[in-house]
């Protein structure tokens, strides 16, 4: 097939998370998907090791999801959920989500279209809740450095990634950031994981006391930081954090957008770390990425106050045209059925051991500082001298080069700076996993050679 991507150079999209110079290059245009693979418009086949953007957990050709969408489109393609009007798929999905989440008793579900909107909604819920309780000063939200919570105004402010703040006048003044719990990168010499967790918890408490506990409303955290590079919490971290939050009556918002529905080998990421949140955000795997949908799970403690207050003032005035879209809800319901029928956490745990061990076998590479992960999520961090304090020069673009070599050999990864994320579909076969490990090794060998060349030029 002739190469036809040139016709899309200088295309008309203002693309997300894309620099201007990239718009003058040929874009990678994906045309179709099949299982764990995607194909570009020239017919080249790629193993998709990021499940699109952490979401296509059931791969790209799950006919049951397509059939669920078609059936709903032929029955009721759209109706809204405003003014106590709704649809059966949205009611059924809300009930199913409440039944599935067992770490804490949740009472209500609010539907949005993306994880960003879900986390934006969380902040408005928290504010509404505290206003209803007569605590208008209790509005600040504590997030963490390196976290990713979305790209709307509030969710981008919550995110602890400077490029998401620069030129956007972010973060807003009501958002505070505490430290990233990355033990490998930030522990002191001789400090154990538990001691590191204690130090971070003490610093969190100091921040709360400095701001005034009466002004701090909530703390938001991903069980495992995803986009930041699959950063796992150190031992006892969340136990200590939750003790402090309870002490000062601060709500816990669990951002399960990446971790939820089996990614870490548990149905929700918080199950792995004994997290008992007041509010939960879910998205991505909720529909396996087949339809845009997200949800906020609200505890009885919060929903009862919100509903009571709305009776006094006339309404809870927040929502989106497509909240609880019937087609998206029908697809999500079918995805959740598949997860249950196939015992998806068992599937993930079965294949994840080989996934983690197969890739961590490359950890001795002189250009790798750390390979970290759990379940079907893994990140490789490239550094010099195997030290977090010795990053490669920015212009060397080591992670980007590795990602380009993976693509050359037929595999797509996420390269952000000098860390590379992988989160493959749950239905990845053992043969596909062998292919993943083989291509990773080839791309790593190329990258090691490239770094040696750059070092020799620098001398």
Curated annotation (Swiss-Prot):
Expressed in placental tissue of immature fruit. PROSITE patterns: AA_TRANSFER_CLASS_3. It catalyses: vanillin + L-alanine = vanillylamine + pyruvate. One of its GO terms (biological process) is phenylpropanoid biosynthetic process. Residues 428-459 form a coiled coil. It comes from the Eukaryota. The modification N6-(pyridoxal phosphate)lysine is found at residue 284. GO terms for molecular function: adenosylmethionine-8-amino-7-oxononanoate transaminase activity; pyridoxal phosphate binding; transaminase activity. InterPro entries: Aminotrans_3, Aminotrans_3_PPA_site, PyrdxlP-dep_Trfase, PyrdxlP-dep_Trfase_major, PyrdxlP-dep_Trfase_small. Disruption phenotype: Low pungency phenotype, characterized by low levels of capsaicinoids, and accumulation of high levels of capsinoids, which are non-pungent capsaicinoid analogs. Pathway: Aromatic compound metabolism; phenylpropanoid biosynthesis. Keywords: Aminotransferase, Coiled coil, Pyridoxal phosphate, Transferase. Its EC number is 2.6.1.119. Optimum pH is 7.0-8.0. Pyridoxal 5'-phosphate binds at residues 115-116, 255, 320-321. It holds the Pfam family Aminotran_3. Involved in the biosynthesis of capsaicinoids natural products, pungent alkaloids synthesized from phenylpropanoid intermediates in the placental tissue of chili pepper fruit acting as repellant on herbivorous mammals and conferring spiciness to hot peppers. Can transfer an amine from vanillylamine to pyruvate forming vanillin and L-alanine. Can use pyruvate or oxaloacetate, but not 2-oxoglutarate as amino group acceptors. Is able to convert (S)-1-phenylethylamine into acetophenone in vitro. Belongs to the class-III pyridoxal-phosphate-dependent aminotransferase family. This is Vanillin aminotransferase. It comes from Capsicum chinense (Scotch bonnet).
């Amino acid at each position: 097939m002739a190469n036809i991507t040139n016709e899309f150079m200088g295309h008309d999209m203002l693309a997300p998370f894309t620099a201007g110079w990239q718009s003058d290059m040929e874009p990678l245009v994906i045309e179709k998907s099949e299982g764990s693979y995607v194909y570009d418009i020239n017919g080249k086949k790629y193993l998709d090791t990021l499940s699109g953007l952490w979401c296509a957990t059931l791969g790209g050709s799950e006919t049951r999801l397509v059939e669920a969408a078609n059936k709903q489109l032929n029955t009721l393609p759209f109706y809204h959920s405003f003014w106590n009007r709704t649809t059966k798929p949205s009611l059924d999905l809300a009930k199913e989500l409440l039944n599935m989440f067992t770490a804490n008793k949740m009472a209500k579900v609010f539907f949005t279209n993306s994880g960003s909107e879900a986390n934006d909604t969380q902040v408005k819920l928290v504010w509404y809740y505290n206003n209803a309780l007569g605590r208008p000063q209790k509005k600040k939200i504590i997030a963490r450095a390196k976290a990713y919570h979305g790209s709307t105004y509030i969710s981008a402010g919550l995110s602890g990634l400077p490029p998401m703040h620069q030129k956007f006048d972010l973060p807003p003044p009501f958002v505070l950031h505490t430290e990233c719990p990355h033990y490998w990168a930030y522990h002191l010499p001789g400090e154990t994981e538990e001691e590191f967790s204690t130090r971070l918890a003490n610093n969190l408490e100091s921040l709360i006391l400095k701001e005034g506990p009466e002004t701090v409303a909530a703390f938001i955290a991903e069980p495992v930081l995803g986009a930041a590079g699959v950063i796992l919490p150190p031992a006892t971290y969340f136990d200590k954090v939750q003790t402090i939050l309870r002490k000062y009556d601060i709500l816990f918002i669990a951002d399960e957008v990446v971790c939820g529905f089996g990614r870490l080998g548990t149905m929700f990421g918080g199950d792995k770390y004994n997290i008992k949140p007041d509010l939960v955000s879910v998205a991505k795997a909720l529909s396996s990425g087949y339809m845009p949908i997200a949800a906020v799970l609200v505890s009885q403690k919060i929903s009862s106050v919100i509903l009571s207050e709305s009776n006094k003032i006339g309404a809870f005035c927040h929502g989106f045209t497509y909240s609880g879209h019937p087609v998206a809800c029908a697809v999500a319901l079918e995805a959740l059925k598949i997860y249950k029928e196939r015992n998806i956490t068992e599937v993930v745990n079965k294949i994840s051991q080989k996934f983690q061990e197969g890739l961590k076998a490359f950890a001795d590479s002189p250009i790798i500082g750390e390979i970290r992960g759990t379940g079907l999520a893994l990140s490789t961090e490239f550094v010099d001298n195997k030290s977090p304090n010795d990053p490669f020069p920015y212009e060397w673009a080591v992670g980007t080069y590795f990602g380009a070599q993976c693509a050359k050999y037929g595999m797509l990864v996420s390269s952000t700076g000098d860390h590379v994320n992988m989160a493959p579909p749950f239905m990845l076969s053992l043969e596909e996993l062998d292919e993943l490990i083989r291509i990773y090794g080839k791309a790593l060998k190329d990258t090691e050679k490239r770094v040696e060349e750059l070092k020799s030029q620098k001398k």
